[in-house]
Amino acid sequence: VCAYIIGLPVPEDYFSSLKACSDSLTTGCFVSWRTYRKDSEAPQFIADEKFKAVVINPLTWTNETSLVSASLNKGGVLKNFNHVVPKVVSAQIHNNILWSSKPNVPGKIFYTQKNFHIGDINLFYINIRENAEARIKAFLKNQL
């Protein structure tokens, strides 16, 4: 249906028969992103990569590079997965990474990290769940 290869760089030509998803309902494809705070530069090891990584924005499920408002973020979850925070971050593709705004959570003033890898799934949790369900339905519909 779809491989969610989240938090890892995937070169555009890495798979011979699996391509990056082009929209929210494409099947037989993959999505990937690595999340960093907006306006931060990626670490040197990313800058040194000799390939263009696939980056799909989990708020639009495309590779368009425009800023996508947090209003499209249906909800992220905190580390205990016991509370959904709607509109938790915006997102924008930038130079082989996904930029996001600082999470809109209690205590965000103390959140100084630039690398949001720990939140690659949490920040977009509801969007990912709903997308997986939509892709499964699209896949099954195409099987008939």
Place the predicted regions along the sequence by residue.
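Surface cap/lid and interfacial helix-loop subdomains adjacent to catalytic sites
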Residues: V1-A134, A138, N142
